[in-house]
Amino acid sequence: MAAEKILKPESQLKKAKYDEKKSEEFLKARAARRVANKQKRAAILERNAAHQKEYEAAERAVIDAKREAKASGSYYVEAQPKLVFVVRIKGINKIPPKPRKVLQLLRLTQINSGTFVKVTKATSELLKLIEPYVAYGYPSYSTVRQLVYKRGHGKINKQRIALSDNAIVEANLGKFGILSIDDLIHEIVTVGPHFKQANNFLWPFKLSNPSGGWGVPRKFKHFIQGGAFGNREQFINKLVKAMN
């Protein structure tokens, strides 16, 4: 006796076709995402290479200008820095209300916390008010990069989130053309048009006590007097390296 052919109910057939269609759509969508991600990675690498060329060109321009000045018997005057990195080196005790408010304004609410500040007439005045409680200076590209990659966190929905990949940066700063961690670094280093948004996105850096200590007999004297506080110009890079 021939086996009877068992027909599947129409609802099952429809579901099977639907599942097959969804599976095809899923595979197509996954393939499209892979292509898009590959293109995005290539674009980011291209932008990073352009940033690197920009940094190198700026360094060469300064070196060439110094050589020309020396050859002509004159002095090269460097452009006024546009960026400082500020580290709070004193706790909350014995800080008057006005400097305390400035520290809060600059988001330096804890000892050993650090933030980037755009140099303007207004911020220069603020730095004078809090000078006895902070160390600051002009960070190099290398210092900014190391800070962001090692200690960088973003402020997302009032939460402190580690910058573990480019997608976090793009999701929060993509509307400003900042698509990757290196784009973020570039915006900070160059004090670009969206510096404010980029800097506000960065959570204040939480640094450690300097390895080997402060190396000064009296911490709360000005840097130029052998202490730790105040403007240490390019020497901020050495301090950050010891605290990072």
UniProtKB/Swiss-Prot annotation:
SUPFAM superfamilies the record matches: Ribosomal protein L30p/L7e
GO MF term set: RNA binding; structural constituent of ribosome
Coiled coil: none
GO cellular component, one term: cytosolic large ribosomal subunit
A Pfam entry, by short name: Ribosomal_L30_N
Keywords: Ribonucleoprotein, Ribosomal protein
A GO BP entry: maturation of LSU-rRNA from tricistronic rRNA transcript (SSU-rRNA, 5.8S rRNA, LSU-rRNA)
InterPro entries reported for this sequence: Ribo_uL30_ferredoxin-like_sf, Ribosomal_uL30, Ribosomal_uL30_CS, Ribosomal_uL30_euk, Ribosomal_uL30_euk_arc, Ribosomal_uL30_ferredoxin-like, Ribosomal_uL30_N_euk
PANTHER family for the chain: 60S RIBOSOMAL PROTEIN L7, LARGE RIBOSOMAL SUBUNIT PROTEIN UL30
Family per record: Belongs to the universal ribosomal protein uL30 family.
Stated name of the protein: Large ribosomal subunit protein uL30
Species per Swiss-Prot/TrEMBL record: Candida glabrata (strain ATCC 2001 / BCRC 20586 / JCM 3761 / NBRC 0622 / NRRL Y-65 / CBS 138) (Yeast)
